[in-house]
Amino acid sequence: MRRTLCLTVSLTVLALSQAAHAQTASPDAAPDIADARIATSVAPLVVTANRTALAPDKVGQSVTVLTLPQIQADQETVVADILDRTPGVIVTRSGGVGEPTLLNIRGAASDQTMVLVDGVKFDDPSAADGGYDFSDLLVSDVSRIEVLRGPQSTLYGSQAIGGVVNIVTADATRPLQGDAQVEGGSYGTFYAKGGIGGLDGPLSWRLAANDYTTTGISAFDERLGGHEADGYSNQGVSGRLGYEFSPDVSVDLRGLFVSARSDFDGFSTPSGNFGDDSEYGTTREAIAYAGLNFGLLDDRLKNRLALQYTTTDRDNYDPTDAPVTKTFDGVGTNARAEYQGLLAIAPGWQGVFGAEHEQSTIAVSTPAFNDPASPAFFPPGSPPVSAHVSTDSGYGQLQAEVIKGLNLTGGLRYDDTSSYGGHVTGQASAAWSLNGGDTVLRASWGQGFKAPSLYELYSEFGSTNLRPEQATGWDAGIEQHFWDRRIDLQATYFSRDTNNLIVFVDCFDPANPRCAFGGFFANVDRARAQGVELSGAIRPLRGLEITANYTRTDATDRSPGATSGNSLPRIPKDTANAAVSYIWPIKLTTALAVRYAGKSFDDIANTMPLKAYTLVDLRAVYPLTSHLEVYGRIENLADAHYETTFQYGNLGRAAYAGLRVTF
């Protein structure tokens, strides 16, 4: 039924596109696909860094912006695989597509990254650490991604220690427009998506849907005996509706829903053995947003009032029992009301300020482990967790061009949380544009924090005495353009210290009540991450582009004890990416991409090594018409065997081909 829905959307778009092409092209016709790719070097505006659109040379923070042509050129179906190619980002996955997928920025833990979808905070309060799992986030209707590196809690609050990832979906720009894509390939993979929308006077709208299925590979490494393929399916729908009552007043409604199912390997029940496992899980994620935008003071003061709601519902099952046993049941929600104001104080001077109220809830249980009749029962059982926490916040930031080309930014934030009280964070940055923008000097300093998760606070392992994890970081760099901007170079040094890290402490003392369940969460660890990010691009000929980036990350444990000085888990010291693409005179585009990740360790004791690896991809795109193209790619051309999580495999050589249409 779900695949039928998505194919119906896709076929409808295809039919409409053919009807549109039969008419004479109008001035606002859809852009030529190939020509759009040639324009990828144009610097887009940056929104996430200051919560308002600014030219890149006015932004002091380190940020990467990925536009729609760049996203389409990568041909990836999973957002995490696109992000894995950006400076400072490491992605780890416990198996193939759909398995747990975690993202680290500059050596920060995955739960220390803020994830936004169309500006809406998207985490999972039901997860043990409260972080976001990227496994179910497909490219689907994504049209833009911004990756903001460094502590950013002043504007974004808890979790923004490593940085912020803002994912933006497509919006309508013409009276009627749409797109569709169908793809198939290795491991029984099928992917289809479609979207349609319009902008007609004051009304704008868009609807989109996707369907993805794959038989997958064994999540447990096949070289260690994994043989059972762990499949995955994902169906999603999204939509947005906007209406302008006047030039100063508008409303904005958005929604997203994802339903996914994944097989997984790990510790089986009831034996507890690690390896091939027949368990599977289902996930349902949803986002709802309603906003009112209005201007005051001759539109010098732009205001936004919004209500946001997100929910994640996860269930795991063991089919080996009769009847099927539910081993995990977790629901996490976030409800937020917020106000944001943007005041144009004077030419080159503006302030952004706001207030937020957020309430997060958790309801988690492990039914199979608590049922004495279940073969998975493990006395004394695991008590269910049901709790909530509320946070009230206020922030303000001033951005000013104090002299021509020199932009300074500074801000403060205060959070009052029901679980631990108040917390203050601040940040400052500078961007100095010289030589007509060909040289940009940047520097930023910021603080970040991560509040204890609801599970860390209220589970049988938790403590309401936990304090927030805290971080202070800075970076400085230069951006240089040469040869009429056909050569772009960037270099950045970064450093961050994090304290009060929350970890699980093993404890087996029967006289200590905190040891009743074998351990507890506590603020005991410290860490430091520092390094260098280098990136560059050269376009020596029309249609030819060469890009590369390299990141050196020294992320180490700074806690007293045996592991002091050890590398943090799953953070390679060296990562690099390079790509060469060329648009031939016949408009065929070919590309070769290489990714390298150095060796790392899966544990803080540094006893479980993860070997270095190199991946090579080939891609090709050919436009049949200005609105219809075929494409294909070979991933992991050399069929390299590698692990990003200890004893979990990854996809070998794989080939995919597809068709994309726009109108």
What are these regions (language model features)?
Residues 1-76, 80-86, 243, 288, ...:
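N-terminal Sec signal peptide and the immediately downstream disordered periplasmic leader
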Residues 79-82, 100-104, 113-116, 132-137, ...:
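N-terminal periplasmic accessory domains that precede
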